[in-house]
Curated annotation (Swiss-Prot):
Example of a GO cellular component annotation carried by this entry: cytosol
Gene3D superfamilies per the UniProt record, alphabetical: Dihydrodipicolinate Reductase, domain 2, NAD(P)-binding Rossmann-like Domain
Chemical reaction(s) catalysed: (S)-2,3,4,5-tetrahydrodipicolinate + NAD(+) + H2O = (2S,4S)-4-hydroxy-2,3,4,5-tetrahydrodipicolinate + NADH + H(+); (S)-2,3,4,5-tetrahydrodipicolinate + NADP(+) + H2O = (2S,4S)-4-hydroxy-2,3,4,5-tetrahydrodipicolinate + NADPH + H(+)
The protein, known as: 4-hydroxy-tetrahydrodipicolinate reductase
Amino acid sequence: MKITLVGNGRMGRQIADVVAASGAHVVNRVLDVNDTIDAAAFSGSDVIIDFTVRSAFLANYPALIASGVPVVVGTTGWDDVMPQVREEVVKARSTMLYSANYSLGVNIFFRTLREAARLIAPFEQFDIALSEQHHTGKADFPSGTAIKAADEILNSNPRKRTIVRELQEGRKLQSDELQVASIRLGSVFGVHSAIIDSESDTIELTHTAKNRTGFASGAVRAAEWLVQRHATSPGFYTMDDFLNDLFSA
């Protein structure tokens, strides 16, 4: 499998290391976030893996779609335009997979959280909130992973209807609001926690990333899956689509 990497930052370099160690695939091209990109840049590639920033992705995604090469996207912070991107992917009969986090471990965390949120829904004594920690270089907050975790809760627990990213002084949190607290600290790779609390006890679910290897390995594995899916069923996919196949195999 010939892979073009869009983005030569920490995640891009980690993916290149994982690919080199596997011996099964090759990175045939690396495009920098500041490069001018058109569809021809992806000629000869089997799959594209994009880990850039919001502004670069928004500038580049038309070329990604037009290339006809399946695209794995790990860039976060563009949820507001996702419906538009999805529509363009489907219209062009292209193939794209998006996830805020490709780590298998964190996706098991999502599924565990989904079930926990569903289980506490009938019991009003249990409240729930989220927190996330990342290094000081991470620009977006809450993280894409935290937003995905919040969506899991909102979709599984009807008592929570909206996300609150910041609390103003003197403002009381409403019972139907889900607080998502963000911390930027040092060189933390990523810590995501769900806290479920009642008068009697507290339950904590936490995923801690020790390094970027899990993210990179998951992205490469997702790329393998997407290449096969592109051949038979082009479209816009999420990590859940990939994991449903993976866990049912």
